A protein has these predicted regions:
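Hydrophobic alpha-helical segments at protein termini of multi-pass membrane proteins
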Residues: 1-138
Length: 138
């Protein structure tokens, strides 16, 4: 049941993004200061700032979009997508970042495009609401 702090799908997107960026902060700290002794921390920080932070934000947006669909459309399958899609994107990022620059760039571009698509879908549904109190997606 929706609460006053979570009464529309965009709330799920905002909360998902904030949570994912909090996780990214912790993960980036670990990578920069703990894991790599042989690479200068500034190099790791720059690469992670340009790739990992947008990836985590994208995963949070994807998770939030599907969570919003689950809550406000009563879509049972969306809750699984809210978990599986970010897991897939993060796992693919982890694998491709060290495997192939070309494949990584294609994957990274696809991730960003897919994120913009989902975000736009939620924004359009928000704009199509008849009144502010309406909670369901159209």
């Amino acid at each position: 049941r929706p609460k006053s702090e979570f009464n529309e799908p965009m709330d799920a997107v905002v909360y998902g993004t904030l949570i994912s960026l909090g996780f990214a902060t912790f993960e980036n700290y670990e990578y920069v200061y703990v894991y790599f002794d042989n690479v200068p921390p500034i190099e790791i920080a720059i690469v992670r700032a340009l790739t990992a932070i947008p990836l985590h934000a994208s995963c949070g947006i994807i998770m939030g979009c599907f969570l919003g669909m689950h809550v406000f459309r009563n879509s049972d399958f969306a809750i699984f997508k809210a978990l599986l899609y970010p897991i897939f994107f993060h796992a693919a990022y982890n694998y491709l970042v060290g495997e192939s620059l070309f494949l990584f760039l294609i994957f990274f571009g696809f991730t960003l495009i897919y994120t913009v698509f989902l975000y736009t879908k939620i924004r359009i549904s928000q704009e199509n609401k008849q009144k502010e109190e309406e909670q369901k997606l159209n």
